[in-house]
Amino acid sequence: MARPRPATFDKVKTVAENRRARFDYFIEQTYEAGLVLTGTEVKSLRFGEGSIAEAYAEVKDEXVWLVNANIPEFSHGNRFNHEAKRPRKLLLHEREINKLHGAVAREGMTLVPLSVYFNGKGRAKVELALAKGKKTHDKRETIKERDWKREQSRILRDRG
């Protein structure tokens, strides 16, 4: 009889989120990619530090790289501490990389990180979105829809 899984395997800890990306882009498809990190970067992320607000991903040399993601230096790190905004390699299957490369090159799409998290096994992952940029009028429509939904819920709450 197999041992039951520990409760820690079911938990997902979100470290950084790019909430602005869902407003600025039409999200076509999402991918889960592994993140190649050094030891001090992992420790820094486990403390909840890190930002992907200005980050993006690019396909270069048959690999996908996360660029401009800020993982601050580990406070207790020594001389082997990492560089805060260095490009970090993302781990994807080859067919996924080829698909992303084709979409970015031909269709004018962008690769945007939506969140960085630790999965149930404790591995650092990035939720990567294949997205198309919104125009200003699209953003206005999104704001109107959001306000209308908020107003509807307010009306229903007051009524009931």
From Swiss-Prot:
Region described as Disordered: 135-160
Subcellular location: Cytoplasm
Keyword RNA-binding found: yes
Keywords, alphabetical: Cytoplasm, RNA-binding
InterPro entries xrefs: SmpB, SsrA-bd_prot, SsrA-bd_prot_CS
A Gene Ontology BP annotation from the UniProt entry: trans-translation
PROSITE patterns in the record: SSRP
Predominant location: cytoplasm
Biased composition (Basic and acidic residues): 138-160
Pfam families in the cross-refs: SmpB (PF01668)
GO cellular component, one term: cytosol
GO molecular function, one term: RNA binding
Membrane spanning residue stretches: none
PANTHER family in the cross-refs: SSRA-BINDING PROTEIN, TMRNA-BINDING COMPONENT OF TRANS-TRANSLATION TAGGING COMPLEX
Family: Belongs to the SmpB family.
Physiological role: Required for rescue of stalled ribosomes mediated by trans-translation. Binds to transfer-messenger RNA (tmRNA), required for stable association of tmRNA with ribosomes. tmRNA and SmpB together mimic tRNA shape, replacing the anticodon stem-loop with SmpB. tmRNA is encoded by the ssrA gene; the 2 termini fold to resemble tRNA(Ala) and it encodes a 'tag peptide', a short internal open reading frame. During trans-translation Ala-aminoacylated tmRNA acts like a tRNA, entering the A-site of stalled ribosomes, displacing the stalled mRNA.
NCBIfam families: PRK05422.1, smpB
The protein, known as: SsrA-binding protein
Native species: Sphingomonas elodea
Lineage, highest ranks first: Bacteria, Pseudomonadati, Pseudomonadota, Alphaproteobacteria, Sphingomonadales
